[in-house]
Amino acid sequence: MRARNAGNVGTVPVRPYTIVSCAISVDGYLDDASPDRLILSGPEDLDEVDELRARADAILVGAGTVRADNPRLLIRDERRVAARVAAGRPPHPRRVTLTASGQLDAAARVFAGPGTPLVYATAAAGPSARKNLRESAVVIDAGAELSLAAVLEDLYSERLVATLLVEGGSRILRDLLAAGLVDELRLAIAPFFVGDERAPRFALPARYPHDESDPMTLVSVRRVGGVAVHHYRLGERFKLRQVPS
């Protein structure tokens, strides 16, 4: 895969409309360092994320998130599932993950749901991924190095993914944001600290395009249950309809 024009500067990019949605502590952590998953948001926030999932054509997470959190990446509300089916869409978005090691377990919940997930693997990781997953996923050769721009272009051009929801992990979030491949950022901030440098952070060090000279546009700040949801526009493709009322 080779990206032709996956960014959002100058011309219309050949990639999905990309939304990043994640929950963090007030000091910027995505989780703590314990074996158990840290709960950062409540039912009201999770319901809004479920609505974002229902609007998306695919949901993307990294292999580290699959191993650490074992997510299902399915729509929870059956009414939203029914609405998608009534509109002629698949019941759930396509599930997508990326791996540079191929170390994925076919028993993970992400591979157990309806439909066939996509796994983008480096050339070196592809054989291991295919051996481990067998018929549980379609493994796609992403070249010597995983290019997120090329992955997004493939999702758009070959898999017909028009809207992509990205839910983690920290390195994928960093790389997408640093490469200018995100149109919309939804950040749910929990009212407590983690304070553990071993824990994964939201914004890892990088050269981000939206610095003090070109900041993101703050669209809204809302209280949703016990968290504060910050909503940002990162490019000209922003769709105002994505903001819940």
Model-identified regions with their sequence ranges:
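Enzymes that bind and transform nitrogen-containing heteroaromatic metabolites
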Residues: 1-245
